[in-house]
Amino acid sequence: MTVVEADGHYVEPFAVKNLFIYSGETYSVLIKADQNPSRNYWIQSSVVSRQPKTAPGLGILNYYPNNPRRPPPSATPLAGPAWDDVNSQLAQSLLTKARKGDKYHRPPPRSADRVIVLLNTQNKVDGYYRWSVNNVSLNHPKTPYLIALKHNLTREFDQTLPPDGYDFKNYDIYVKQNNTNGTTSSGIYRLKFNSTVDVILQNANTMTVSNSETHPWHLHGHDFWVLGHGHGKFDIYKDPLKYNLVDPIEKNTVAVHRYGWTAIRFVADNPGTWAFHCHVESHFYMGMGVVFEEGIERVGDLPTSIMGCGATKGLRLP
């Protein structure tokens, strides 16, 4: 099959036998129906990045008017890539680029005004496992950020700014860390309106020996350019020199692979508060996410119909 679109943007077409799709992503593919029309063919979906505990999902590709109940020639479909085949997963990510000549493609800004590095970790907080970013696990406040910021309800969330990075030099991403002292926070990143922001997603070992999981990160309110992917620890001096600034794909969800890194760039030009989080829902609710604020002063009056949570319960504002 040939991949032609990802997250609403045309890609330079490339052919694959297996397509890796992570939670929150969308793809369009073309399949050329040029095989023997008297046969049926297997379609299979499998879990990757975490050892599966369930059987693969199966379907049948049928040529009309061939009987769809006729089984394919083989009793079972061919096996796809192994669940932990990170090289194949990374190869697809590197192949996904903007379509040449696409008049809708926007080139990225040549440089960034701010760089934020987000280390994906697993921690224990009060004896419970939590997912974290830079060893800080996001706690969602009862009052929505947008309302709290617009109406200066500063007591409704932590005013301490989250860290822009971690101890790059000394943190070993391949080792199970003693992350039993993780902290929680509802603090947010405050971005200058219309600024260009680079975010480096760095994956690391979990609190299980020799274990790292793929995380699909999704940004609300924006599309971003995917500038690069790589194995191992991101080098803040060398790896930016390898960024793809020619034909990077625009997406809203991107994977950071096991023991790897992913670099994205976006323009903070949409007034409001926007979540950026792992799109594995349980990971987000367990703390793997951040919130960006940009241009809150440009947000118009908020309708009273959205009041009702936290400090806004029963609040009626003109």
Predicted segments, located by residue:
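Histidine- and aromatic-rich segments of cupredoxin/plastocyanin-like copper-binding domains
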Residues: 1-113, 117, 121, 128-140, ...
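Intrinsic, low-complexity N-terminal interaction/targeting segments
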Residues: 1-8, 159, 165-173, 187-188, ...
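Active-site-adjacent structural elements in folded domains
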Residues: 11-15, 181-186, 247-250, 259
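Intrinsic-disorder/low-complexity, polar/charged segments enriched in Ser/Thr/Lys/Arg/Asp/Glu/Gln
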Residues: 26-28, 113-117, 184-186, 194-198, ...
